[in-house]
Curated annotation (Swiss-Prot):
Binding locations of FMN: 61-66, 76-77, 83, 105, 140-141, 184, 194
Keyword flag NADP: no
Database matches in HAMAP family: PdxH
PROSITE patterns: PYRIDOX_OXIDASE (PS01064)
Designated name of the protein: Pyridoxine/pyridoxamine 5'-phosphate oxidase
Needed cofactors: FMN
């Protein structure tokens, strides 16, 4: 651990100019995401989701992006989990994508809402049966006595539902509607490129931030 302070890297992969980016952040996100896929970045749809509880205590965890369009960024989870409890009282969140191989980050802030039951059903039934059973078996974020508790619950719900488990009411999707997005491109000498989008009415204001 003594060598942590000495870990460093020079960023030389690319550059980003505020005069060349699109007026709306979504096309740039989609371009960067596609490039992350082509570069074979590990799990390019993995993102940090940061929430806060009623008292303002923050929590962060990795979740998977399952949709990105003009309506926002979609992910799915247990509504009774810590993140679900946080979003019930504070429906604001932040997302962070880090594509190390491309020396890029994307930060997103916005308001969060549940997706429709129809949309949750559609995604839930596209998942493998074992994952659908897992949504029933795990009381996410609750204290449990041991691993056997989960395994017994899994057996019980497999016996009850077979290969066609329905979506539990406590499981579904959220959509973050962005109000701010920042695109970060690593550059030499730590003089990184940071292009910031902020929603102003129905338009996006684009500015360059100091690194």
């Amino acid at each position: 651990m003594d060598s942590i302070a000495q870990l460093r890297k020079n960023y030389t992969f690319g550059q980003l100019s505020e005069t060349e980016v699109p007026h709306h952040p979504l096309p740039l996100f989609q371009l960067w995401f596609d490039q992350a896929v082509k570069a074979e970045c590990p799990e390019p749809n993995s993102m940090t989701l940061a929430t806060a509880d009623k008292a303002g205590n923050p929590s962060a965890r990795i979740v998977l992006l399952k949709g990105a369009d003009q309506n926002g960024f979609t992910f799915f989870t247990n509504y009774e989990s810590q993140k679900g409890q946080d979003l019930a009282v504070r429906p604001q969140a932040a997302l962070l994508f880090h594509w190390h191989e491309l020396e890029r980050q994307v930060r997103i802030k916005g308001l969060v809402e549940r997706v429709s039951a129809t949309e949750s059903d559609e995604y839930f039934h596209s998942r493998p049966p074992a994952s659908r059973i897992g949504a029933w078996a795990s009381p996410q974020s609750a204290a449990i006595p041991n691993r056997e508790f989960l395994e017994e619950a899994e057996k019980r719900f497999k016996s009850e539902f077979g290969e066609a488990p329905p979506r539990p009411e406590h499981w579904g999707g959220y959509r973050l509607r962005p109000t701010e997005m920042e695109f970060w491109q690593g550059r030499p000498s730590r003089l990184h490129d940071r292009i910031h989008y902020k929603l102003d009415g129905s338009n996006w204001k684009v500015t360059r931030l100091a690194p």
